[in-house]
Amino acid sequence: CSVFLSGRKENRYISIAFPLLLIAFSCYSIYSSPNREREKRLAVQRYAEEQQWDRVLQTIHTSNSSEAYYHPYLMLALNEKGILPEQLFHYPVQSADRIYFPANELGGANFNSLFAYALGLKHEALHQLAQANAMSPQGLSFSRLRRLIDWQTESGNLPLAQKYMDILQTSTCHNQWIKERTERISKSLTTSEEAYKEDFIIDASSPLILLTQAIKADTTNRKALDYLL
């Protein structure tokens, strides 16, 4: 009888210990440094896509701001807020190379599309976004698809915007978003605005070339001038 009771106690301890170990392992996996860092990077990327620049800066402040990955997002956020020249020297950014990512990386092309869009280079923004979609193992993502629709609409390429809308319409979580964009496209169709055109070819491998072309297109481009200064 005592052996039987001892066995029951051991089984009870095991049944309690195993879930606790599983919870502990799960907490470690979620809150370990590599995973926290990845979550912060994804958060910065998402906030930048949504143009929530204060949240971009706030997230970077809670991370390692000396990490080179954050510097392009940091400078873009400061530039979009119009405070880049005044605030940049408060951060450990020491090279002009830190304003841009290599174009042959998925994360790089995704950011570079935001960078080009901020400079007013819409076609280059679309080109970089297409590059990001082509490099992604999952193909089109919802966030990049939404940007394609908005940017094509702004560029006046409404038929292509509608094609991307047709793709997004197959999802089940964008009904309200699609309704709003459909109304926007319908209003755009009633105007006679010409599609946006860039009459130059851009070497997107160099941010300085992008900045130079942006200033050539508009010598009062404050965002491009702030980057150069």
Name each model feature, range by range:
Residues C1, I14-I16, L42:
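Alpha-helical transmembrane segments of polytopic membrane proteins
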Residues I30-F200, A204, L208, A214-L228:
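Soluble catalytic regions of membrane-associated enzymes that act on cell-envelope
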Residues K9-N35:
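Internal/C-terminal transmembrane anchor helices
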Residues C1-G7:
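Membrane-embedded alpha-helical segments of integral membrane proteins
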